[in-house]
A protein has these predicted regions:
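Intrinsic structural disorder
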Residues: 1, 64-65, 84
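Surface-exposed loop/interface segments of Gram-negative outer-membrane beta-barrel transport/assembly proteins
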Residues: 2-41, 81-82, 91, 95-199
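Short, P/G- and charge-enriched loop/turn segments at secondary-structure junctions
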Residues: 43-47
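Outer-membrane beta-barrel transmembrane strands
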Residues: 49-68, 73-76, 182-213
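Solvent-exposed loop/turn segments connecting transmembrane beta-strands
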Residues: 52-53, 81-83
Length: 213
């Protein structure tokens, strides 16, 4: 007897609960407590996207009283709330159970394999190379010269004519280790992490009698 099942699910994520509450009425200095500007757009709303995660899974089971086989595969694909952040994950599971010698001997073997690749994960709880630091620290309403956050979003890099390369464009001297243009980090300093995991399990059980095995 064989049984096949397929399941799929999709979830949507928003960054509503992790965003600090900002004041958008005073600007002019880095501490964001300058003159009253009668309100300013909250650019953090435009920075975060709607995350989408889709999981598809397929399983197959078949067998008889003497032997049972089970196989499953699951695929996860997600796009995070920060631009460029994504996750791909594959899970494989195979299990075989067999009975011998009039069900006195049972052999159970299982293998579980996982492959995962993540792109542009934000640093959790850290300052360095974290795009959220520049996003949250940027002065409300813009900086000297009338340059607001959208200007640095659209012009995160500028040409260094002397070296003929593109430099980071940020209101703090091209950025520091602790605060940089978020879009420079996302587009020019991407990160990727890959994980592999394989688990093997084998058990052999022999039943001598009803009391001992």
């Amino acid at each position: 007897r064989a049984s096949i099942s397929f399941n799929t699910s999709t979830t949507f994520d928003i960054a509503a609960y992790g965003i600090p509450e900002f004041q958008n009425h005073y600007t002019g200095v880095s501490t964001s407590w300058g003159s009253d500007i009668k309100g300013s757009p909250d650019y953090t709303d435009d920075f975060f996207k709607t995350g989408v995660t889709t999981i598809n899974s397929l399983s197959l089971s078949m067998g008889s009283q003497a032997m049972q086989t089970y196989f499953s595969y699951a695929n996860t694909y997600g796009k995070g709330v920060v631009e460029g952040n994504s996750l791909v994950k594959h899970n494989f599971n195979f299990r075989e159970t067999a009975n011998f010698l009039n069900n006195k001997l049972t052999v159970d073997a299982n293998i579980n394999a996982m492959y995962q690749r993540g792109n542009n994960r934000t640093t959790s709880g850290g300052y360095y190379m974290n795009p959220l630091v520049g996003l949250y620290h940027f002065p409300r309403g813009g900086v000297e010269g009338g340059k607001d956050f959208n200007y640095y979003k659209d012009n995160y890099q500028i040409l260094n004519a002397g070296r003929n390369i593109m430099d980071q464009n940020w209101y703090k001297s091209q950025g520091t280790d602790m605060e940089q243009n978020p879009y420079w980090l996302i587009n020019k300093v991407p990160n990727e992490d890959t994980r592999y995991r394989t688990l093997l399990n084998l058990s052999v059980k022999y039943k001598f009698n009803d009391l001992f095995s």
